[in-house]
Amino acid sequence: MPTDAKRPLQLNDQGQLRHFISLDGLPRELLTEILDTADSFLEVGARAVKKVPLLRGKTVCNVFFENSTRTRTTFELAAQRLSADVISLNVSTSSTSKGETLTDTLRNLEAMAADMFVVRHSDSGAAHFIAEHVSPNVAVINGGDGRHAHPTQGMLDMLTIRRHKGNFEQLSVAIVGDILHSRVARSNMLALKTLGCPDIRVIAPRTLLPVGLEEQYGVRVFTNADEGLKDVDVVIMLRLQRERMQGGLLPSEGEFFRLYGLTEKRLKLARPDAIVMHPGPINRGVEIESAVADGAQSVILNQVTYGIAIRMAVLSMAMSGQNTQRQLEQEDAE
């Protein structure tokens, strides 16, 4: 079903979240609302009974065309804690492996009365395509699409930063590693810019840097890690995505670690209270050494905890936005 050209695809007529495809174009107030809502859901995870009834009677379908243990599991937990029914589609054994198109798969899932799709796909733009073509009553959440976006990872990273560092307006944040292939890097740069971070640094070899980062995201680019890490408050390490690389981008993983790997010595260039983050999975000895990943400044496991709360916030807000839009359209029809 084509989207209304007068309204941004992700928002309803009242500016509420309806789909969550990308952080691009979303206002600061909405990102802050997601963070505030997630903060309130963190308390749910500390209870003996970790459930609230916000999505009772709703069905959330996780459609993962690309493998992911952490993202899929946290989305499942988030939906279950909101009391939704959850279906997780194993694409490798589904009809898509027998030639069924993406649209046909979604139509069949719609026929099962799913209220929301969480989609992960190797093609950039897949989540947007799905949001444009599903029934108007179905919300679509992007669980990662190609190199394009991973908006819930971006927001859980922002929640991690805010809970450890307060507001964003005095911070220096460095994103280090395979920027070229990273949807996480793109989502983080957009979120940091929108939330008012004044100093966003990107550190990578030239071969792993997209063209035009400075103009598009307002970041500072460094090819020397030691220079880029000086006095930063937050270090976000990214893994080398070998599965998306073609030959010639790197001489070797050992050379990458020597020049860009986060060691205890290199971390000392950052502020003494700097935090270390990583979206996972971690390649120890490639982009980060174990002493840092497991050290006192690491908040990597906190990111996983906060990820459940962020996904609870996004699922509940998108479902609420869909319900509001449906009510508005019914009132207009009357």
Curated annotation (Swiss-Prot):
Gene Ontology CC: cytosol
Positions annotated to bind carbamoyl phosphate: 70-71, 120, 150, 153, 280-281
Q: So what EC number does this one have?
A: 2.1.3.2
Keyword terms, alphabetized: Pyrimidine biosynthesis, Transferase
Pathway terms, separated by semicolons:
Pyrimidine metabolism; UMP biosynthesis via de novo pathway; (S)-dihydroorotate from bicarbonate: step 2/3
Q: Give the reactions, separated by semicolons, that this protein catalyses.
A: carbamoyl phosphate + L-aspartate = N-carbamoyl-L-aspartate + phosphate + H(+)
Q: Which GO terms describe its molecular function?
A: amino acid binding; aspartate carbamoyltransferase activity
Binding of L-aspartate: at which residues?
A: 98, 183, 239
Which BP terms does GO give this entry? 'de novo' pyrimidine nucleobase biosynthetic process; 'de novo' UMP biosynthetic process; amino acid metabolic process
Subunit (UniProt): Heterododecamer (2C3:3R2) of six catalytic PyrB chains organized as two trimers (C3), and six regulatory PyrI chains organized as three dimers (R2).
What HAMAP family does the record tag this protein with? Asp_carb_tr (MF_00001)
Task: Write down the PANTHER family for this protein, in alphabetical order.
Answer: ASPARTATE CARBAMOYLTRANSFERASE, ORNITHINE CARBAMOYLTRANSFERASE, MITOCHONDRIAL
Role description: Catalyzes the condensation of carbamoyl phosphate and aspartate to form carbamoyl aspartate and inorganic phosphate, the committed step in the de novo pyrimidine nucleotide biosynthesis pathway.
Of which family is this protein a member?
A: Belongs to the aspartate/ornithine carbamoyltransferase superfamily. ATCase family.
Instruction: Return the protein name.
Output: Aspartate carbamoyltransferase catalytic subunit
